[in-house]
Amino acid sequence: MELWFTENQDENLRFSLKVKETLVVEKTPYQHLAILDTYQFGRVLTLDGILQTTEKDEFVYHEMIVHVPLFTHKNPKSVLIVGGGDGGSVREVLKHPSVERVVLAEIDEAVVRNSKKYLPTISQALDDPRVEIMIGDGIKYVNEHKNEFDVVIVDSTDPIGPAVGLFTSDFYKAVYECLKEDGIIVAQTESPFIYGKLINKLSKMFKEIYPITKAYIATIPTYPGSLWTFTMGSKKYDPEEVDINSIPRIDTKYYTPEIHKAAFVLPKFVKDIFDEV
């Protein structure tokens, strides 16, 4: 008998993967977690039936949410990651030799624990001595820390369940205070094909708070619509003014200096979503 995982991406759209083996299923205090081994995309992490990451294409998301802001900042030493308990963003952050401290604020310890056990290629950096894992509410952590981080990465799930509070103006204002005077925030801001209204709303929030607000894109096959957006808010540095010739080559599969520049060239319909008043 064939076993398939199916994600209901919205009321009219489903995405399915054929499953080799169910590795773990756990009902945590916050959500329903499963890690499955699939034929096409390797091991995958799902939360509440929504695909979070896969071994085959995770590098696109993690490289783009990390390297674009960290190479925009002139000298990132301290980085806060809100969410991201699978460890992929931590792995990418630690490719930057200037980084001295990474705080991972993850609300659900089961995500960290199971990722370490079943997703070693993604979670491999979580035991690095520069990493502090804070199991708890990332919003509360942000509110309690002022002028502390060079870069804040909001590596959240979709805007449902535990992540709802990470898509609010109050949270982005708190991040502004959490950042140093030349700090940068980047957040994953969903698919323009599915969440156009939300993206426009978030863009307006960022523009009200951060003097420099830019959107960029990447293609992630297993995410709804495949085309994915990220929104960056910066107090000082413009990501489009980075001299790409000065960006050092690091070990990546998707991100390059050329991709850094190209990612900010938005299709017209995406630009319209971000620019609509």
UniProtKB/Swiss-Prot annotation:
It is found in: Cytoplasm. GO terms for cellular component: cytosol. It is an enzyme of class 2 (transferase). CDD domains: AdoMet_MTases (cd02440). GO terms for molecular function: spermidine synthase activity. Residues 2-235 form the PABS domain. Keywords: Cytoplasm, Polyamine biosynthesis, Spermidine biosynthesis, Transferase. Its EC number is 2.5.1.16. One of its GO terms (biological process) is spermidine biosynthetic process. Pathway: Amine and polyamine biosynthesis; spermidine biosynthesis; spermidine from putrescine: step 1/1. The keyword Transferase applies. The active site is at 155 (proton acceptor). Signal peptide: none annotated. InterPro entries: PABS, PABS_CS, SAM-dependent_MTases_sf, Spermi_synthase, Spermidine_synt_N, Spermidine_synt_N_sf. It comes from the Bacteria. It catalyses: S-adenosyl 3-(methylsulfanyl)propylamine + putrescine = S-methyl-5'-thioadenosine + spermidine + H(+). The keyword Transferase applies. S-methyl-5'-thioadenosine binds at residues 31, 106, 137-138, 162. Catalyzes the irreversible transfer of a propylamine group from the amino donor S-adenosylmethioninamine (decarboxy-AdoMet) to putrescine (1,4-diaminobutane) to yield spermidine. Homodimer or homotetramer. PANTHER family: SPERMIDINE SYNTHASE, SPERMIDINE/SPERMINE SYNTHASE. Belongs to the spermidine/spermine synthase family. This is Polyamine aminopropyltransferase. The lineage of its organism: Bacteria, Bacillati, Bacillota, Clostridia, Thermoanaerobacterales.
